[in-house]
Amino acid sequence: MNLRLCVQALLLLWLSLTAVCGGSLMPLPDGNGLEDGNVRHLVQPRGSRNGPGPWQGGRRKFRRQRPRLSHKGPMPF
């Protein structure tokens, strides 16, 4: 009686594990025969917006430079 209970418990545990894992305990295919539904395209990662691009320093080069504080005259800001 005790042996039968242990076998039933092990069978129930095995069935619950295979149901939760979705049958992933089976060996996976090697990937030589890809199906159309399983093909995924790799996505290129996007770089930062204001990082160094074609010009070093990004958009900073095109901003108006602040005037030096050693000038004579009214303050521009």
UniProtKB/Swiss-Prot annotation:
GO molecular function, one term: apelin receptor binding
Signal peptide limits: 1-22
Lineage: superkingdom: Eukaryota
Bias (Basic residues) ranges: 58-71
Localization, UniProt: Secreted; Secreted, Extracellular space
Region (Disordered): 43-77
Keyword vocabulary terms for this entry: Angiogenesis, Cleavage on pair of basic residues, Developmental protein, Gastrulation, Hormone, Host-virus interaction, Secreted, Signal
Tissue specificity: Expressed in the brain with highest levels in the frontal cortex, thalamus, hypothalamus and midbrain. Secreted by the mammary gland into the colostrum and the milk.
Pro-sequence residue ranges: 23-41
Post-translational modifications: Several active peptides may be produced by proteolytic processing of the peptide precursor.
One GO cellular component term: extracellular region
UniProt GO BP: angiogenesis; apelin receptor signaling pathway; coronary vasculature development; drinking behavior; gastrulation; immune response; lactation; negative regulation of blood pressure
Main location: secreted
Sites annotated Important for the balance between G(i) and beta-arrestin pathways induced by apelin-13-APLNR system: M75, F77
Keyword Secreted: yes
Function: Peptide hormone that functions as endogenous ligand for the G-protein-coupled apelin receptor (APLNR/APJ), that plays a role in cadiovascular homeostasis. Functions as a balanced agonist activating both G(i) protein pathway and beta-arrestin pathway of APLNR. Downstream G proteins activation, apelin can inhibit cAMP production and activate key intracellular effectors such as ERKs. On the other hand, APLNR activation induces beta-arrestin recruitment to the membrane leading to desensitization and internalization of the receptor.
Similarity comment text for this entry: Belongs to the apelin family.
Protein name: Apelin
Native organism taxonomy: Eukaryota, Metazoa, Chordata, Craniata, Vertebrata
